Amino acid sequence: MVELHDLQPHWGATKEKKRVGRGIGSGHGKTAGRGHKGQKSRSGDRKMPPYFEGGQTPLYMRIPKRGFKNPTRKEYTPVNVGVIDKLFEDGMEITPEVLASKGLCDEKDRVKILGDGELTKKFVIKAHAFSKSAKEKIEKAGGKWEIIS
């Protein structure tokens, strides 16, 4: 009867671990299969990252630097007046919180109103920025725009 302590893998399912550097009688002594000298024979040899070029100045350092990251940059979430016209009723006051409730932006986002689409309803729109065409369309429809900080 087979018991738990008698279980072992099927013959051929596992491979013996190759023990290298254990004397010449093993067949893998002396250099342990690493050959003579060179980077790959040394201890600590590992796969080099793809950008390593053998010690010569790497490509990313040979190419000149360009541009910079502006630490004071302000990013805006764009919302078009045509979208506002479709989603909201006439006479409403539109704020970033109202736009966020409809899923057009996050509540924390800075909002810029752009002038794509037609505006047929009157709105009071409060946002962080407006394009020139958006301002014109809001005023033409009889609405008002207001910049908030």
From Swiss-Prot:
Entry keyword rRNA-binding = yes
SUPFAM superfamilies documented for this protein: Ribosomal proteins L15p and L18e
Annotated GO biological process? translation
Query: Which UniProt keywords are present, listed alphabetically?
Result: Ribonucleoprotein, Ribosomal protein, RNA-binding, rRNA-binding
Q: Where is the composition biased (Basic residues)?
A: 31-40
The lineage's top-level taxon is Bacteria
Using the UniProt annotation, give all residue ranges assigned to the region (Disordered): 1-64
Quaternary context = Part of the 50S ribosomal subunit.
A single GO CC term for this protein reads: cytosolic large ribosomal subunit
Q: Name one GO molecular function term.
A: structural constituent of ribosome
Q: Name one Pfam family in it.
A: Ribosomal_L27A
Output the InterPro entries linked to this UniProt entry.
Answer: Ribosomal_uL15, Ribosomal_uL15/eL18, Ribosomal_uL15/eL18_sf, Ribosomal_uL15_bac-type, Ribosomal_uL15_CS
Q: Which PANTHER family does the entry mention? A: 50S RIBOSOMAL PROTEIN L15 (PTHR12934), LARGE RIBOSOMAL SUBUNIT PROTEIN UL15M (PTHR12934:SF11)
Which family is it part of?
Answer: Belongs to the universal ribosomal protein uL15 family.
**Name of the featured protein:** Large ribosomal subunit protein uL15
| Known function | Binds to the 23S rRNA.
Q: Which organism is it from?
A: Aquifex aeolicus (strain VF5)
